[in-house]
């Protein structure tokens, strides 16, 4: 009787231990897989990044054909230093200004150019005559003039700070010349002379 009771309690403990072990195992597996970190969503890459990766990380403003067809032209700037006088008054310090009277040339032909030499073979003397160096940017500067009597006068002058090349086409010049020629060639009194001649002929016949 005692042995049967011990055997019964032993089976009961074995069943309880088996259930708790299976529950512990299931809990462990659930906890393990519930804390799996999801991969972070990739940040949307912009088109510029994709293009940069495809082009090897280099950015080009234009293609090679544009480089050969478009010739960038610049002025050979002339700098002058002079004194300004007004009667018996002369500027205390010399005035340094930029004179836009140089020749327009491609950038590779300018003395301070450090880039490549593309586009120079398309340049000719005729092309240089179509471009003119003109004023681009100016600023107002104050200068002091000292007179012989010891007084000091202050003047405001405009100083050129940058030059640019402006293109004048040959057709524009020719059309302007033709317009002037035709306007000058038309006699104003031509029709009046005809009327006078017709009137004089009528009087003579009458």
UniProtKB/Swiss-Prot annotation:
Lineage, top ranks: Eukaryota, Metazoa, Chordata, Craniata, Vertebrata
Biological source species: Gallus gallus (Chicken)
InterPro entries the record matches: Cys_knot_C (IPR006207), Cystine-knot_cytokine (IPR029034), Sclerostin/SOSTDC1 (IPR008835)
Function according to Swiss-Prot or TrEMBL: Can activate or inhibit Wnt signaling in a context-dependent manner. Activates the canonical Wnt pathway whereby acts through Disheveled proteins and beta-catenin. Antagonises Wnt signaling through the canonical pathways presumably by blocking accessibility of certain WNTs to their receptors. Induces posterior neural markers via components of the canonical Wnt pathway.
GO molecular function: BMP binding
This protein's name: Sclerostin domain-containing protein 1
Subcellular location: Secreted
Subunit field text: Interacts with LRP6.
Record has Kinase as a keyword: no
Annotated gene: SOSTDC1
Basic residues: bias regions: 188-206
Family matches, as Gene3D superfamilies: Cystine-knot cytokines
Ranges for region Disordered: 40-68, 176-206
């Amino acid at each position: 009787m005692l042995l049967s009771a011990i055997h019964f309690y032993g089976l009961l403990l074995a069943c309880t231990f088996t259930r708790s072990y299976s529950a512990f195992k299931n809990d462990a597996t659930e906890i393990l897989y519930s804390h799996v970190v999801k991969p972070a969503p990739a940040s949307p890459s912009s088109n510029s990044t994709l293009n940069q990766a495809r082009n090897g990380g280099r950015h080009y403003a234009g293609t090679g054909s544009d480089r050969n067809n478009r010739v960038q032209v610049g002025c050979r700037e002339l700098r002058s230093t002079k004194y300004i006088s007004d009667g018996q008054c002369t500027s205390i310090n010399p005035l340094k200004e930029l004179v836009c009277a140089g020749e327009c040339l491609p950038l590779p032909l300018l003395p301070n150019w450090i880039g490549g030499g593309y586009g120079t073979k398309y340049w000719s003397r005729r092309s240089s005559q179509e471009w003119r160096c003109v004023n681009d940017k100016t600023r107002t500067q104050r200068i002091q003039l000292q007179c012989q009597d010891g007084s000091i006068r202050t003047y405001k002058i405009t100083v050129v700070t940058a030059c640019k090349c402006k293109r004048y086409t040959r057709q524009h010049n020719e059309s302007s010349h033709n317009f002037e020629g035709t306007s000058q060639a038309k006699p104003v009194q031509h029709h009046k002379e005809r009327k006078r001649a017709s009137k004089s002929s009528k009087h003579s016949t009458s």
